[in-house]
Amino acid sequence: AKLGHRVTLIGNVGVDNGSDYIFKAMEQHGVNTAGVRRCAGEDTGSSFIFLAPNGESVIAILSGANASLTPDDITSNERLFDNAGYCLIQTEIPLESAKVTAITARRHHAKTIIKPSSCDYLPDSIVANADILVPNEHELAIIETEGKTMEDKAAHLLERGAGCVIVTQGEHGCYLRGQNVEC
């Protein structure tokens, strides 16, 4: 939104000071919050990122209201996918909701970017709907058990249907693997 692009968010927040701050910030930057629901009795989800000098990070995630985002929340907001160019999906929401989001985005011809974090596995139904899959090295080891090397794991994700895989590597940059590119 800060770069002048239309941004729309679908998700859940709690009814707390955190959500008040989030709504004010999104409003200031022109983010469409029509798909954001306030959930009474829930805390707003939060993440704490600890970054080491070498670029490696440790992330602690408290899902909060994000854990209650349902596939129905996505389908009831399908109109928000109209004319979307990209759809960024984080897996701090339930995997079934992430799957429905990816399928819905694809149906609307949006490129899907999936950032798998805080999940024990990533089902084929999500991988196959990812135009761009962006795990870090640790997440890659969790979501892809086939292969021993990063390169083998990324290649297997392509076989499972991902369009391309970008593995972030802290201070070492990133590794890109697509159907016709590897670097």
Residue spans for each PLM region:
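Structural motif
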Residues: 85-86, 132
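Short beta->alpha connector loops
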Residues: 15-16, 92-95, 116-120
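Structural motif corresponding to alpha-helix initiation and N-cap regions
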Residues: 45, 71-77, 95, 119-121, ...
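Gly/Ala-rich phosphate-binding loop of Rossmann-like dinucleotide-binding domains
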Residues: 1-2, 106
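Conserved N-terminal subdomain of the carbohydrate kinase-like
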Residues: 2-85
